[in-house]
């Protein structure tokens, strides 16, 4: 569909900024083949050095891909992983990163999630917004988070590093999960106190009722 091709265009041209002379590898499986095809078509508009590989489902996140797939991953500069289960935390992905590939991973991506929601973001605008949020975190040491559903926590950052997940993956060795749009910071050990309420989903499963985690000095002391 045009909506899928539009999202694929954003991934190829904005997130990865693929260049004409680059080798591009798209990895997909039977459950995500439609997404893989649209990514292939848009990449082919930029470069003719494009390969689409369909592999069997790995059945669980983190399981190594077949050896031929791992081998070919090491030989490409740009890799797009659109598979049901994540390959992010595999030796094959780590080796490809070490060889200088830049990688975008979209575990569990399907037609609906590819056409709508976070995948349709303006990633150039998102990069500017995330950068602004990241600079705020770097200047602050005490963080308080609250929500209408009942989350109320405080913690210290302790001057930890801040990771900006903005979806732009244009340098060798970079890896990004899409859709993006997060700022990460580790709390200082023992500094977090309060309650976190999760009222949406947990590990990809919609919750029937909210999940509350009570935290004291950085440790979860009660779950209800």
Over which residues does each language-model region extend?
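Dual-mode signal for accessory low-complexity, basic/Gly-rich regions
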Residues: 206, 222-224
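Active-site bordering "gate/hinge" segments
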Residues: 1-208, 212, 216
């Amino acid at each position: 569909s045009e909506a899928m091709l539009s999202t694929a265009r954003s991934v190829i041209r904005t997130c990865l900024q693929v260049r004409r002379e680059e080798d591009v590898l798209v990895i997909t499986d039977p459950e995500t083949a439609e997404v893989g095809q649209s990514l292939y078509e848009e990449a082919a508009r930029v470069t003719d050095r494009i390969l689409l590989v369909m592999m069997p489902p790995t059945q669980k996140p983190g399981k190594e891909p077949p050896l031929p797939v791992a081998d070919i991953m090491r030989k490409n500069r740009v890799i797009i992983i659109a598979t049901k289960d994540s390959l992010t935390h595999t030796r094959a992905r780590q080796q490809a990163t070490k060889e200088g590939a830049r990688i975008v991973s979209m575990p569990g991506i399907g037609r609906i999630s590819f056409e709508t929601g976070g995948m349709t973001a303006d990633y150039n605008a998102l990069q500017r917004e995330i950068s602004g949020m990241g600079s705020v975190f770097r200047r602050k040491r005490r963080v308080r988070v609250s929500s209408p559903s009942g989350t109320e926590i405080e913690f210290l950052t302790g001057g930890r590093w801040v990771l900006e997940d903005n979806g732009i993956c244009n340098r060798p060795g970079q890896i990004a999960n899409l859709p993006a749009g997060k700022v990460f910071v580790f709390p200082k050990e023992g500094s977090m106190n309060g309650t976190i309420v999760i009222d949406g989903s947990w590990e990809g499963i919609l919750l029937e009722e909210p999940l509350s985690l009570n935290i004291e000095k950085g440790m979860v002391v009660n779950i209800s």
